[in-house]
């Protein structure tokens, strides 16, 4: 691949740039398929914020959160294969390729309700029924709304990327005064389990730009709302972060309100005429915003509880699970019902209603089940393949224990027996323990090392896959078995 350099006046032949190879050029598929699935995955918590109860904590479990599953697959190079002639361990390495995936969700459909007991909504700017020219020091109100409706399903072998806006460091020459608006910049981060989706108030770091703590619903008050950076992931040269994605977003503006506060960037008299009293100062801010609404939730527009077949990925990685890892990013607030639990405060049954005699609690529950169809593949260890993987994803070669061997040393080495003893010198050239590159991130870890099966017809997704291949559940899948053939004709038995 060759690109023209920007700013050059003489158009010389561009400098060639190394191309990223499609995984299909060096990965051979074996047509051996496995089914893998999880148990029923459940999570329960408070829908708005974590709650401390003694030494324990009720986690925050909101329908507006991402669920990011880090799926560990077994190493196929240490796998008990049905046919030992499938590959040559001295010349090849085995990898997994994703063929199908299904994310199943339980629980009934329900709108996601959020809000704030002291929300900064000064006036109704939609219905003009009275004139207000002043604001008090505190005009906050109890407000509830249904969040923007979102469904997201994104699969890759590295974590998905999210984007958000946050405050930036101003230039040295631009000295900000107290109370001035800070500059903003767009940043990226891995989408982790529990990160908040964008629910109609923008993708931003609200902990940094929301000093009033009243401009947003409670569940995103001190959070970073992320939006998947589809543009960046689509341009990823390796194509590891996004094999494919499915999404559905739905929102409309239900109410239009005005924010309270001192507007330092108020419109000038170029945009309006002053009143007959000669007062040109606007008493009410012109900062309008719309309260989002996700509207109708229906089974007609669900992207879950259905299979997805991966024939061609959008990037150069056609579904290969490098390092035996998959990252499944899910966002779904169409099952956002929150339970209200009321308990008598003194433990005795109530005979008449008295709000001071019972406690109320808030809980949200989620239910998932994941299923995959995996194909066994092999990668031939050639100089070109090793060079390509070294530049693309060096950790793959490290896990395969492939590297440049140092020359044999002619110096006599010393080996101490009790190297950890206080009587022995401190050990040198100690090989550090292998670190998990995702140790500092939060994911829902799923171990499928012992969950793979060749009997596809015993599972719902497996039967659907067989139907795609034109085979029914009654069809016996023949496994390839190496047999020695003889050139001598078979002798007929005498009757």
Curated annotation (Swiss-Prot):
InterPro entries, per database record: Capsid_L1_Papillomavir (IPR002210), Capsid_L1_sf_Papillomavir (IPR036973), dsDNA_vir_gr_I_capsid (IPR011222)
Domain of life: Viruses
GO biological process, one term: virion attachment to host cell
Entry keyword annotation includes Disulfide bond: yes
Subcellular location per the Swiss-Prot or TrEMBL entry: Virion; Host nucleus
GO molecular function: structural molecule activity
SUPFAM superfamilies xrefs: Group I dsDNA viruses
Record's keyword terms, sorted: Capsid protein, Disulfide bond, Host nucleus, Host-virus interaction, Late protein, T=7 icosahedral capsid protein, Viral attachment to host cell, Viral penetration into host cytoplasm, Virion, Virus endocytosis by host, Virus entry into host cell
Cellular component annotations (GO), alphabetically ordered: host cell nucleus; T=7 icosahedral viral capsid
Pfam families, A to Z: Late_protein_L1
Disulfide bond among keywords: yes
Subunit comment: Self-assembles into homopentamers. The capsid has an icosahedral symmetry and consists of 72 capsomers, with each capsomer being a pentamer of L1. Interacts with the minor capsid protein L2; this interaction is necessary for viral genome encapsidation. Interacts with protein E2; this interaction enhances E2-dependent replication and transcription activation.
Family membership noted in the UniProt record: Belongs to the papillomaviridae L1 protein family.
Protein role: Forms an icosahedral capsid with a T=7 symmetry and a 50 nm diameter. The capsid is composed of 72 pentamers linked to each other by disulfide bonds and associated with L2 proteins. Binds to heparan sulfate proteoglycans on cell surface of basal layer keratinocytes to provide initial virion attachment. This binding mediates a conformational change in the virus capsid that facilitates efficient infection. The virion enters the host cell via endocytosis. During virus trafficking, L1 protein dissociates from the viral DNA and the genomic DNA is released to the host nucleus.
Protein name per UniProt: Major capsid protein L1
Organism lineage string: Viruses, Monodnaviria, Shotokuvirae, Cossaviricota, Papovaviricetes
Gene that specifies this protein: L1
